[in-house]
């Protein structure tokens, strides 16, 4: 039987505020455990929450960027459940009247642009973080994250493959970053998602029972988790006639490469939602709506159009650059510093992106300052170093944040342009590569490429390639 995959995502994005949603505690990441807490966010008796105005501002901004209807009158609700990371034993969220309804995100697919509908955007407070110790019978709790404001962006089940889900996340991340709503640092947990997935017979319009997958913290893990769950459900249907998937919450175990059962999936009634009695309904005024529209910065679609007009780059290069605001910003700063746009793109999308992936470095934390990158490229242009040596220098710059001139001096990588020194290397290579020399003299001009490579190898990448080629041609023509 052929199946169609149905996927919907619930994306949590922490808002870029300096303080928490209901108190003055800092939201800064990386503090000592339980340092950024107070009686309010810990829910101690006698404390009352005060809604952070900037939270409403950023939530409205998210709704505007994502084409939502802004509900001018909305309210906060209590979501009741017990878990160690929730000190109040309830979470202040939004239930039946969220701040934003509807909306959509347009994603690229192999068949063109696809519109993925949104169900809603609502405001809520984040929970704490459980730290599970290996080989220990207990866990630790860090409450710093309790009360950090976030928006939950809920999609409709419009995605039909793990690849589409990843594109949705990438596009959404770019939108939120560009609008300065969230930094979306998945490595720090400021953007997370739960995935809902089910299968149905191709051609069917009915939805089957969905499974929710939690513990997904990167685009790569999202794709893997959905692919594995897709395969698991397909096998259950194929080998068990009349089988019905049970509604449950599963956790992605990246170590084992599979989803594992956490608990039976709850319904809204299980959470006993009721209006938050300590916070009055939220009224979104027309002045705020106007302010949000006026301050909306350049969004990814607009930046893409500008890049196509302003820079001589291919569409795929532009797509990768604008996908990540910090990366696109780095590119533009490098071009502003005097670097040619194609050269800047080649370095960023080549060696830089490779090292970022290998070291899991976030684009907001690139260890090579723009001015150092520009210096390196200038050193190649002025023939102070070869392209081969430049790659070695860049790797060291990425590891240490040192200036390129310092690395070149430490490693002795200055390009050899002294003709007498190169002449000796050229003669050595000619004397030791008789076959290639004879091939060249017999008319196989491509043989000179091999000889140039041998000189570069002998010089450990420091010889000036154009000078080497010129000297080889001169000697071989005598």
Swiss-Prot record:
Taken from the record, one Pfam family name reads GatB_Yqey
- Keyword Nucleotide-binding in record: yes
| Biological role stated in the UniProt entry | Allows the formation of correctly charged Asn-tRNA(Asn) or Gln-tRNA(Gln) through the transamidation of misacylated Asp-tRNA(Asn) or Glu-tRNA(Gln) in organisms which lack either or both of asparaginyl-tRNA or glutaminyl-tRNA synthetases. The reaction takes place in the presence of glutamine and ATP through an activated phospho-Asp-tRNA(Asn) or phospho-Glu-tRNA(Gln).
Chloroplast among keywords? no
**Subunit arrangement?**
Heterotrimer of A, B and C subunits.
Q: Which residues form a coiled coil?
A: none
Q: Which reaction does it catalyse?
A: L-glutamyl-tRNA(Gln) + L-glutamine + ATP + H2O = L-glutaminyl-tRNA(Gln) + L-glutamate + ADP + phosphate + H(+); L-aspartyl-tRNA(Asn) + L-glutamine + ATP + H2O = L-asparaginyl-tRNA(Asn) + L-glutamate + ADP + phosphate + 2 H(+)
The record's Gene Ontology biological-process terms are:
translation
According to UniProt, the name of this protein is: Aspartyl/glutamyl-tRNA(Asn/Gln) amidotransferase subunit B 2
InterPro entries from the xrefs? Asn/Gln-tRNA_amidoTrfase_suB/E, Asn/Gln-tRNA_Trfase_suB/E_cat, Asn/Gln_amidotransferase, Asn/Gln_tRNA_amidoTrase-B-like, GatB, GatB_C_1, GatB_Yqey_C_2, Gln-tRNA_amidoTrfase_suB_CS
The Gene Ontology terms for molecular function here are: asparaginyl-tRNA synthase (glutamine-hydrolyzing) activity; ATP binding; glutaminyl-tRNA synthase (glutamine-hydrolyzing) activity
Q: Which family does it belong to?
A: Belongs to the GatB/GatE family. GatB subfamily.
The EC category is ligase
Query: EC no.?
Result: 6.3.5.-
Q: Keywords for this entry?
A: ATP-binding, Ligase, Nucleotide-binding, Protein biosynthesis
């Amino acid at each position: 039987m052929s199946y169609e995959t149905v996927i919907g995502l619930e994306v949590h994005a922490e808002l870029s505020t300096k303080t928490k949603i209901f108190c003055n505690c800092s939201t800064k990441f990386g503090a000592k455990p339980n340092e950024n807490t107070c009686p309010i966010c810990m829910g101690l008796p006698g404390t009352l929450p005060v809604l952070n105005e900037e939270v409403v501002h950023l939530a409205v901004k998210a709704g505007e960027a994502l084409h939502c209807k802004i509900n001018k009158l909305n309210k906060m609700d209590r979501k009741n459940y017990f878990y160690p990371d929730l000190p109040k034993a309830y979470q202040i969220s939004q239930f039946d009247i969220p701040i934003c309804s509807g909306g959509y995100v347009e994603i690229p697919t192999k068949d063109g642009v696809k519109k993925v509908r949104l169900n809603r955007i609502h405001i809520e407070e984040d929970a704490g973080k459980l730290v599970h110790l290996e080989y220990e019978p207990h866990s630790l709790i860090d409450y710093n994250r309790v009360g950090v404001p976030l928006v939950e962006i809920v999609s409709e089940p419009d995605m039909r493959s793990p690849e589409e889900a990843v594109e949705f996340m990438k596009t959404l991340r770019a939108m939120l970053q560009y609008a300065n709503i969230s930094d979306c640092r998945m490595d720090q947990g400021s953007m997370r998602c739960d995935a809902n997935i089910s299968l149905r017979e191709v051609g069917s319009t009915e939805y089957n029972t969905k499974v929710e997958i939690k513990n997904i913290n990167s685009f790569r893990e999202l794709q893997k988790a959905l692919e594995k769950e897709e395969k698991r459900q397909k096998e259950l249907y194929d080998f068990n006639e009349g089988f019905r998937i049970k509604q449950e919450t599963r956790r992605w175990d990246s170590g084992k490469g599979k989803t594992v059962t956490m608990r039976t999936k709850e319904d809204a009634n299980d959470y006993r939602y009721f209006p938050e009695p300590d916070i009055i309904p939220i009224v979104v005024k027309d002045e705020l709506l106007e302010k949000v529209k006026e301050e909306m910065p350049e969004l990814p679609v607009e930046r893409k159009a500008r890049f196509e007009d302003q820079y001589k780059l291919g569409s795929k290069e532009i797509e990768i650059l604008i996908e990540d605001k910090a990366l696109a910003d780095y590119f533009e700063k490098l071009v502003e510093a005097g670097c040619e746009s194609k050269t800047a793109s080649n370095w960023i999308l080549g060696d830089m992106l490779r090292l970022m992936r290998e070291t899991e470095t976030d684009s907001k934390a690139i260890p090579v300052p723009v001015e150092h990158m520009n210096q390196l490229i200038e050193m190649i242009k002025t023939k102070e170093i070869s392209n081969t040596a430049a790659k070695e220098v860049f790797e060291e710059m990425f590891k240490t944040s040192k200036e390129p001139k310092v690395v070149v001096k430490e490693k002795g990588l200055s390009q050899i342009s002294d003709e007498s020194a190169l002449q000796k290397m050229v003669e050595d290579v000619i004397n030791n590569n008789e076959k290639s020399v004879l091939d060249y003299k017999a008319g196989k001009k491509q043989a000179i490429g091999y000889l140039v490579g041998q000189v570069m190898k002998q010089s450990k990448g420091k010889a000036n390639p154009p000078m080497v080629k010129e000297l080889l041609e001169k000697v071989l023509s005598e």
